Amino acid sequence: MDTKLTPPWLRQENNLLNPEVTQRLFINQDNIPNLPTEAPQVYLARFLEWVEPLVSKVKFVKAQAAVQDYLNSKACAQIETIIAERAQNTHSSWLANWWVQYAYLTSTGPVSPEVNAPYYLELPTVGWSQAELAAALSAQLWHIYQQVQKRQLTSFSVKDKLFSLDTLQSIFASCQIHRADGDVYFVNDQPANFIVVIKNNVFYKLVIDNSGSLEQLQAQLQLSFVQILDNELSHPPHWNLLTATTTKAESQSLLDQLWAQNPEMLLDIYNSAFIVNLDNVELTTPLQLLRNSTWTPNFNRWHAKGIQLVITKNAQLVILADHTSFDGSSVATLANIFVSKLQKVNTEGASALTPTMLSFPTVDQDKQKYFKQLSKNFKDYVYNAVMFELKWDWFTKPLIKAKGIKNSEAFIHLCYQIAQYQTNKKLQNTYVAVDMRQYFRGRTECLRPLSKQSVAFVKRYCKDPKGTLKQFRKYYPAIESLHFEKTRLAQKGSGVNRHLLGAYLAWNEHQDTIAKPALFETKAWKTIAANPLSTSSIVDKYLRNFSFDPVEPNGIGIAYAIDDTNFRAILSVYQHNLQYLKDWMKHFEQTVKTILKTLK
């Protein structure tokens, strides 16, 4: 190969943000509605309503004045014209590429854990071997990839509602690539005929023949995985650490060196449909599995690849997905497509696919020392976030309903607010992710659960718990109703934050011709955009746990779910704020138990 070829991450035909690539990838063949725009008068009125409980009266009055000035300004008209023009594309959304560029490609730390998100799946495959599970999963994922290539898997229905699966178009054969002057999202929409397998930091290429049945492919893959697992060859963490550097410039330098020495190998990694990691460890708890997927002493990763399977020696699965393209709801949907189809196959008479080892440049002693330091730096970065796992079998959705509580999410967030106020005497903004896939390229919006009613209840409760709980039935219905209404608004594209983000980005990209609105500098604007408590809930029978770092330096991250079996959560906080989370968890548990015990 001519090493003077332009690297794929610098080619416009591989750049997700190139309008031609976007148009080629995303075709709204199911006529799913586009993400709606709203008049600024509408979303800014909602902004004032949602932000009022979060700021002082003085700051709120200033925000009201700033909103009025903005609505009367030339800048407002210019910004809305830009958004309206972006909304004309029926095969995208006015926000989608902005979201990719500014929410993810501007990540300043390692792509994992900042962008790569791990999801633990509990599978009905007890007793399976690592090779059996890897083969079944890979065959099913390969089949889904083929369907995506043929545009046979573009949407799904739930209770007569159609949801988009557009994110599948950019999750295969893709990768986020760190560059000092701005990250690139590489995607190859030409059909790939191979996957990459990693075991003990040795990379293997498996070319797949589509001529046989899915069962035949699974048998071939199983024999191939057995061969790879039987191979004792191992390498210390090496060039793959370029995906885990703590600076973009360092990652770019290593990537450029690697491209100059072995471009063929690099292209194999990027162009592969997906990666399968065969980990030589046995882990049991969700938290252990999630943390292992991000950092392990043997590393064994190529972070920021679109989608990866991480399978342990005791056949436990974590899906590592690049959040730039794929969020938790999409992972849950993907799991529900393939998990029910998992079954063992008879390998008698089958032939293994021949694994081809990918050849990395030789690592001399100086480079080994350098990579060892990179590994330490990455470990320090990852473990600066401390995580805890909660699993409460005594706190379930049926129990809540039996207490007369209709909306479990509203109740949980009220308890979060009480715990927060008891911990630091503050009521801060909370991010709650809301699925917007009923729109083409809709992704997520967020709701802000604090309201005047919830704030008043929290303060009453913290002052007089017994007296306040005696009047719980008087206060709670309004809190619950508002939470439900905010959720409904966010689901239909009528939230607050995405519209505010769009207005800001329209100005940001045209600030040479648009004066910066004073509204963007108000305390209220900055407060509604902050996420000291960042939360996300995915309730699914297979996707049981996931994790993410705090969004704010002094904040906490809460990945949780409640269903008929339990309440479970992975909570995160940075080391310097550890005591805050410990106190918060204690107060949260006490609050839930006290309220449930009191309610009859």
Swiss-Prot record:
Pfam families with a match to the protein in the record: Carn_acyltransf
Write out the entry's keywords from A to Z: Acyltransferase, Transferase
Active-site residues? H323 (proton acceptor)
Q: Which residues bind CoA?
A: T396, K397, P398, L399, I400, K401, A402, K403, G404, I405, K406, N407, S408, E409
Q: EC number(s)? A: 2.3.1.-
Query: What GO molecular function annotations does the UniProt record carry, in alphabetical order?
Result: acyltransferase activity
The cross-references to SUPFAM superfamilies, in alphabetical order and at most eight, read: CoA-dependent acyltransferases
Please, which domain of life does this record's source organism belong to?
A: Bacteria
Task: Please state which protein family the record places this protein in.
Answer: Belongs to the carnitine/choline acetyltransferase family.
Which named protein is this?
Putative acetyltransferase MPN_114
